Curated annotation (Swiss-Prot):
The keyword Repeat does not apply. GO terms for biological process: base-excision repair, AP site formation via deaminated base removal. It comes from the Bacteria. The gene is ung. GO terms for cellular component: cytoplasm. CDD domains: UDG-F1-like (cd10027). Belongs to the uracil-DNA glycosylase (UDG) superfamily. UNG family. This is Uracil-DNA glycosylase.
Length: 228
């Protein structure tokens, strides 16, 4: 793959498609009507801003954004600094403590340092109405994020997809397992984590796969940005 290929090159044309324009128009109309929509407009596409196409090493697929105040900021499972880690992220940390030597559970849930190392934290739906989980399902976001997975599938090799839960695993059916790696487990939600997410060792497995490809492993210890 040419390192010059960007998200803009491979999915930029989606912005011109009617389904995409309709999705953005719906979200804009909901905001104008006074509804609170998460994440803020400026953060919707943060995953792509922070992890460029040629930098992607790992994909962690989420469902839709957190729907509480100050949580969602465009990265799956991550919350803004100063907000307690939600239960699913708490279970991700619990798994990291047992899987990665020296991992210490952080006192925050801000995963931007993962994104900056090549972990694409992608939700399948990119907006949600406050307090209403899955309220923006089937608007058109799923079509867009399918195109993202197709682009990764076609233009990259050796990407590690972590697919947690049936929703992510269905979404991942299009991934070519001869070119990429798929790690599957139940969702880290408290409802299902004990069924095999805890103990899945996906984080150490991902680093082993990266090292086998002569790539830098991920430092899974989330770092807060230095205060200016």
């Amino acid at each position: 793959m040419s390192p010059s290929l960007t998200w803009h090159d491979v999915i930029g044309q989606e912005k011109e498609q009617p389904y995409f324009k309709d999705t953005l128009a719906y979200v804009a109309a909901e905001r104008r009507a006074g509804k609170t929509i998460y994440p803020p407009q400026k953060d919707i596409f943060n995953a792509f801003r922070l992890t460029e196409l040629d930098q992607v090493k790992v994909v962690i697929l989420g469902q839709d954004p957190y729907h509480g105040p100050n949580q969602a900021h465009g990265l799956s499972f991550s919350v803004l600094p100063g907000v307690p880690a939600p239960p699913s992220l708490g279970n991700i940390y619990k798994e990291l403590v047992t899987d990665i030597p020296g991992f210490q559970r952080p006192n925050h849930g801000f995963l931007q340092s993962w994104a900056e190392q090549g972990v694409l934290l992608l939700n399948t739906v990119l907006t949600v109405e406050a307090g209403k989980a899955h309220s923006h399902a089937n608007l058109g976001w799923e079509t867009f994020t399918d195109k993202v997975i197709v682009a990764l599938n076609e233009h990259r090799e050796g990407v590690i997809f972590m697919l947690w839960g049936s929703h992510a695993q269905k979404k991942g059916r299009i991934i070519n397992t001869e070119r990429h790696y798929i790690l599957k487990a139940p969702h880290p939600s408290p409802l299902s984590a004990h069924r095999g997410f805890l103990g899945c060792k996906h984080f150490s497995q991902a680093n082993q796969l990266l090292q086998q490809q002569n790539q830098q492993p991920i430092d899974w210890q989330p770092k807060l940005p230095a205060v200016e």
